From Swiss-Prot:
Disulfide bonds: none annotated. The lineage of its organism: Bacteria, Bacillati, Bacillota, Bacilli, Lactobacillales. This is UPF0210 protein LAF_0976. Belongs to the UPF0210 family. It comes from the Bacteria. Homodimer. It holds the Pfam family DUF711. InterPro entries: UPF0210 (IPR007841).
Amino acid sequence: MEIEKIQETIRMIADENLDVRTITMGISLLDCIDSDSDRACQKIYDKITTKAQDLVKVGRQIEAEFGLPIVNKRVTVTPIALIAAASGDADYVKYAKTLDRAAHAVGIDFIGGFSALTQKGYQSGDRVLINSLPQALAETELVCASVNVGSTRSGINMDAVKDMGTVIKRASELDLMANAKLVVFCNAVEDNPFMAGGFHGVSEPDVVINAGVSGPGVVKAALEKVKGQPMDVVAETIKQTAFKVTRMGQLVGTIAAQRLGVPFGIVDLSLAPTPAIGDSVAQILEEIGLEQVGTHGTTAALAMLNDAVKKGGIMACSHVGGLSGAFIPVSEDAGMIDAVNAHTLSLDKLEAMTAVCSVGLDMIAIPGDTPAETISAMIADEAAIGMINNKTTAVRVIPVAGKQVGETVEFGGLLGHAPIMGVNKASSAAMIHRGGQLPAPVHSFKN
C-alpha cells in the first residue's frame, strides 16, 4: 500500500505536472517607516535582503532533496501605502524601485505588496500610491501591486473603483505587462502567497513562510478513472486528490520555514493552472462532463470542484489560508483559451463562474479602446459579488492598445497568451462618476 502511494506521488510529479507553485516569505516593513523616504527605502532594502537572503537557496535544496519542483520563490511585504505615508513624498515610485532592487538582489521571482487598502476610504498614502501605480509598474520588473477597494464589512469604495479604472487604462498605455502585475480586490486576504495579489498583512508575524500548491493535472488524471460515475463520487475523488496535493505543500512549507528559522504560516489550496497542456482547470471541468468550458453547467461543475478542493485540503493541513480554490485565469489556461476562441466562454460567463470559485476576472485581455469607466464598472461588479458572498474576488484585466476582439496578445512564460475578449458597449460612466461609498450588506452586521 505504502509503495503504491509513493509510486503514485512520483507519477503525479513526473506525468501530471504536480508542483509546489510557490514558497512565499512574508516580511513586515512596519519597522522601516521613516519620515525621510531615502532612509525608509534603505531600511526596506536592508530588511528584505537580510531576511530573504537564503530563500532561493533553501528552495533549491528542498527541490533537489525531495524531487519536488518549486516553481517560484517570492516575497510579500506590508502594503507600501502604509509604510510610505510618513514620508510626505509626491509619488512612491522610489519605493517600488527599492522593492525591485531587493528582489533582484535575493534572486526571487516576484515581490508583492506595492499595495493600498482603501475599502472604507482613502488614507494619506493611498491616493499617492494609486497615482504612482502606472509608472511604478512600468519601470520595475518584479514588483506586483494590489488595491483592495471593498469588503463585506465595509462596503465598496466607489471613488477607488473609479480611480482604478483610470489607473489600469494609464498603465496599459505605458507598458503592456504593467496590468499583469496589478490586481484590484474585494475582501483581500493578508496571507496570500500567490501573485500578483499577495501582500503581507499588518496582523501577520514579522516574517512568515506561506506555500501555494498546484495540481490541476493531478485532479484531471484522477477523474479519468471515474468516468460516468455519479457526482458525489467525482467530488470524493477530487477531495482525496486535494488531500495528497496539500500534504505535499505543507511538507515543503514546514521544512522551508524550519530551515529559514521563521514560523510556517499557511498552505493556499488553490488549483493554479499554467499554459502547459494537461495543467488546466478548464480541462478538469471538461473531464467532469462538459463538452467545453463555458457551456451551461460550467458554474455548477466549478462550484463542486472548488468545494471539494477545500474539503480535502482542510483535512490535510491544519493551517490553510490565502485564496484557496480554483483559479480561472484565461491567459494561463490552455482550455480557457480554446473556449474563448470557440466563442463558448464569454466575459459574462466568467463573471458567473467567479461567484463560486477562488478569485475573479483574471488575466483577461480586452480591447485597448475600452473606456476607463467600463473597466471601473467591471471592478464594481466583481467587488459586489465578493461583498455579498463574503468571499475574495478580484479583477486583473489587460487593455491591449491597438488590438480588437478576435486578435491575440502574447505575454510569455507562466502568463501565456490571450485572445482579446469583447466588453459591453453600453456606457456605465454616469454610475461610476457618482463615486461615494456603496454600503455594506445587511448580513455584514455580525456583532
